[in-house]
Amino acid sequence: MSGTRLNALGSSPSKTQKWFRNYAKDLMSSYESSALIQHKVTKGESREYQIFDILDKLLPTRISVKRGVVIVDSQDAESPKFDGVLFDRSLWPLLFQDNDTVVIMLESVLAAFEVKSSLGTRDLQDIFSKAQKLRSMKCMSAGSFFSPPLVTAFAYKCPNRNLAFFDFAVRSQEFPDSTPSLICVLNQALFGLARSDGTTLLRVDQPSAGHIPVMFQTQVDTLLIYIYFLSRWATIGSKTVDTFMKYSDTVFSSLVVFHFDSDFLCSVTSSPSALDKARTCFKGNSSKSINDAYAIARGQIGLG
């Protein structure tokens, strides 16, 4: 339980950290400006463009970042509509293109992408549902990246990070194969997956039974670490991102990772009463640290 610090605390932020923090400020400023737009669809599209523009600027050029993409498999099945897709244009042809609409092969997809203005319970349900449908498609083994593709999401805000992570962890326990690989909450945290080698938590990308839902408590450096993870996906087999990491030793050396213990997750997923009691502890403690809320929740369901 509680937080696992990967290394000792770093000192002053690097130039790279400062640059990415400025990108994050720009994103939040654009988000606040778009709040003045009354038309909901236009407002949502504006916020999608903002984050996709940043990704297009910063990710390796092997990856195309595009909206309006239809993903199909070899059986002619189509994926649900995602806000955007990260896919490989260096090796894979398009199947169809007409103005802003593009049809691509499932095997060319690195990750399907969802954008949320504010991350709540219904948003998480939507992300998991779309991930399940994407992962049920027939993916041939000759893809450029992961088989099946990954799912990631970006949220500008989250009113209760503790509750959101609790919901993420519970759904991940209940539907392991439908779990998104990474959710970014700007300037707050990253929700991801890990496995244990007995003494250490190791980050994993592809969801599977037995994975451990984790929260990287990244705060103002969330965007930097998100770009790092996406770049690592895009450069599989390369040591490029190891070098990228060294440009910000201070942030990576101070990463704290939180996860729930297995007895807690087993209890809340096997008992509706325990689930309700535990969830109330996170719902009513948005201002507390997740460690404190977790300690209260364990007590409420009799785990001490």
Regions found by a protein language model. Give the residues of each.
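Intrinsically disordered, low-complexity Ser/Thr/Pro/Gly-rich regulatory segments
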Residues: 2-81, 86-304
